[in-house]
Amino acid sequence: MGMLRSRGWRLVGSVALAATLAAAGCANDTDTASTPTTAASTGDDRSTTTAEATTTAPERSCDQEPTMSPVEAAPVAATPSDVDVTSFDGTTIRLHWFPAPGDDRHPTVLMGPGWSQPGSTLAQDPILFGALGIAGMNEAGYNVLTWDPRGFGESTGLASVNDPEREGRDVQVLLDWVAEQRVAVVDRPGDPRVGMVGASYGGGIQLTVAAIDCRVDALVPSLAWHSLRTSLHKSETVKAGWAGFLNTAAVTFGGRLDPHISSAAESGVGQGILSDEDREWFISRGPGDLIDQVSVPTLFVQGTVDTLFTLDEAVVNYESLRSRNVPTAMIWFCGGHGTCLTDEGDATLVNERSFAWLDKYLKGNDSADTGDRVDVVDQNAKHWTAADYPVELADPVTAEGAGELTLDATSAAGPLAAPRSGANDILSGSVLAITPSKAATALEVKIDPGKVDALALGAPRLEMSYSGTTPAGDRPTRVFAQLVDDDTGIVLGNQITPIDIVLDGTQRDVSVDLEMIAFHLQPGHTVTLQLVATTVAYAQPRLGGSLDASKISISLPVANDVTPG
């Protein structure tokens, strides 16, 4: 097998930081296996040996046939691990093949990279997003396949944001190719025993592929999304910070993009809006409604401080699978597309649970301990577990207030001045400019938990009666809501929520769920709701004029059936 290697795109300085925002084929520092050193089949030896030769598969039914047979594949000269395969439409997809040591047959794990990146070829990737590393998976008895998605790395074509009809079908061809490998376990001819891991772009593709191809047997998507409408364009408000960041990363590293991507980034940053065509294009990208077609065991891993793909994206996906009795679990950790400003806690948990998930659902080891179905971490690195989500709720912690907010640039949330001392998440330095922070000028409501000593878990609810005026303009009218820990001055989860308002002088009411939180409420420790006029996280709204809130009500959900760790 070809040596795991560093690639030329791993640079230093600000350019490298731009690349790291979505890199996903990553090793946790618990992966300590040595670099594999032997080559294996690249397609000439085809296997029809069934899975029972090596392990027992979980019961399932799948009649998906190969989409291409045989797969047109060509080894890359001087790089034994690399193979170019021809996809359904003639696009060349570069794959990287790292079989487990020895000649036995093993299940295979496909590990997708992050946005703008080629497939990982590193034994231990430095980007600690909680995904599994190649060396660790090889040592655990898995073949590993990574690949350059279309539009990135050495693959041809245009990046289309995990379009089921493009990137989804590309991965189907990779499944076809794996089924032809001599060292791959197959459940029947053309149907390899396959799991998928990866974060961000490499998390989203898992859900898309599993929805269209039943040959996938287990998933561990980290930092994935449900809908690009709710994640990138919440309340019809563009996440301009991330839009610019993602577009810059792709262009910097030579990505070849569908024109809708650059168009949306330019209009989102420049005007604060998307064209109808661009909005519909992003909505059509997976998984969205395709999540209801995913029926394989799935472990969702999401970050409490992820400001790109927030917690609710994982929750919607999780609830779809749970409603259909598909084996699923969910872990929230302090990380993701963002920076953890509090204690990160157990750095090995995600890695251990991910391996256990693959062990149980890919190898068929029923004794593997996959942990609690729901495991979340609070601001003190304390873990809380639950039998399911949503959890049963106790009486909420509530507060009310009123006041006026002048809508000008002095009322702004962010940028963040500095990362937490000693922070080791790779994005700490590169996302400061687009991360919300406590505002110096805001309309505030103090929230006192009283005697409550419990976990606030889920989406706080904000209700407001208001009126106001603002000058005419093309930009949308918005205010933004965030919660601040008064002990530390840190915005809970670094999360801020846009609120669509109408400022025409008429008295109006608005109700909105804020971004989800996991925060330990304790007596004597207050939280403050801040309403601000603008934020670095979203496109600047129309400024000028003021908002007069005659009543603001905020409600924090309090979990009743969670167990502290």
Question: Where are the regions that the model predicts?
Answer:
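Accessory cap/linker subdomain of secreted extracellular hydrolases
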Residues: 58-72, 121, 127-131, 139, ...
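Short substrate-entry loop that stabilizes the transition state in hydrolases
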Residues: 103-106, 111-141, 145, 150-156, ...
